[in-house]
């Protein structure tokens, strides 16, 4: 088919590590030469950062039920320090330009986030413009990389959801291959409000397969799925809009926990923010959250 693949490696000694606080980046340049004549054919470059995310990988039985016990989980860390997400959800849209958001506006968004001590972004609920990920790498923003999958209307109708299995897998594969080399992506997400079943066979294994596509292809990032308790292989618990009391119970349970949406910031909202964060800071297994 005219394609060729190759593999190589290079050891980088004592690199300056990347994090939201210190977004150190390096530039990798790959150049192609004709193997017979040595003629230069062209180059591509990619910015990348060095960082290590450590987490406990959830194991499941053949039915998708989690067999990793709560006590076996360790806090999720980046470069040996607790990963704490002070984040927001963001739709890739603009009141003036609609779905075409200028690069300048995207950069203004990221700069405002940094100025207000936000360090994380959930790309609700789809992959965003490539430039946004470049900015997150550059400025230091942790990103939950979401598959373009939102199934509100069919949330508990597996017999109908299965009709979209090929589409969902295609979007998952596309998101992964497009974003896998982005330093800012610190976790993967299978989308938004998709399903609430712990069974691996639900929707003919659709969501189980999406989760395990990520797990089988990337052992360096944890997997998120809203409302999952680790079943089907997700590596953290997640809920939308829980009570403060629920947060304390999750903190006591030891498994990593993230608020993928909370404190709906519309109208007279964003209540109990201090109480939420008192609960989040009460235990190292708490990952923080993303305001809606």
What are these regions (language model features)?
Residues 110-112, 120-292:
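Substrate-binding/catalytic cleft of secreted carbohydrate-active enzymes
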Residues 1-124, 135, 140, 171, ...:
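Secreted/periplasmic carbohydrate-active enzymes, especially glycoside hydrolases
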């Amino acid at each position: 088919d005219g394609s060729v693949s190759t593999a190589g490696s290079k050891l980088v000694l004592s690199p300056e590590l990347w994090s939201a606080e210190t977004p150190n980046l390096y530039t990798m340049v790959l150049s192609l030469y004709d193997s017979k004549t040595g003629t230069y054919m062209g180059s591509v470059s990619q910015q990348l950062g060095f960082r290590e995310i450590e987490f406990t990988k959830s194991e499941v039985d053949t039915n998708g039920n989690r067999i990793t016990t709560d006590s076996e989980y360790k806090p999720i860390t980046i470069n040996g320090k607790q990963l704490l997400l002070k984040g927001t959800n963001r739709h890739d849209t603009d009141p003036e330009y609609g779905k075409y958001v200028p690069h300048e506006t995207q950069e203004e968004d990221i700069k405002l986030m940094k100025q207000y001590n936000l360090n994380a972004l959930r790309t609700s609920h789809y992959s965003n413009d490539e430039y946004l990920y470049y900015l997150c790498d550059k400025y230091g923003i942790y990103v939950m990389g979401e598959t373009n999958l939102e199934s509100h209307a069919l949330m508990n109708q597996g017999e109908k959801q299965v009709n979209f299995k090929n589409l969902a897998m295609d979007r998952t594969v596309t998101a992964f291959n497009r974003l896998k080399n982005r330093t800012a992506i610190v976790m993967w997400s299978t989308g938004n409000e998709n399903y609430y079943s712990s069974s691996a066979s639900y929707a003919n294994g659709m969501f189980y397969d999406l989760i395990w596509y990520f797990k089988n292809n990337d052992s360096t990032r944890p997997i998120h799925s809203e409302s999952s308790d680790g079943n089907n292989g997700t590596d953290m618990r997640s809920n939308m809009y829980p009570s403060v009391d629920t947060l304390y119970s999750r903190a006591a349970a030891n498994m990593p926990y993230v608020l993928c949406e909370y404190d709906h910031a519309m109208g007279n909202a964003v209540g109990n923010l201090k109480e939420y964060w008192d609960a989040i800071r009460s235990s190292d297994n708490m990952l923080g959250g993303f305001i809606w």
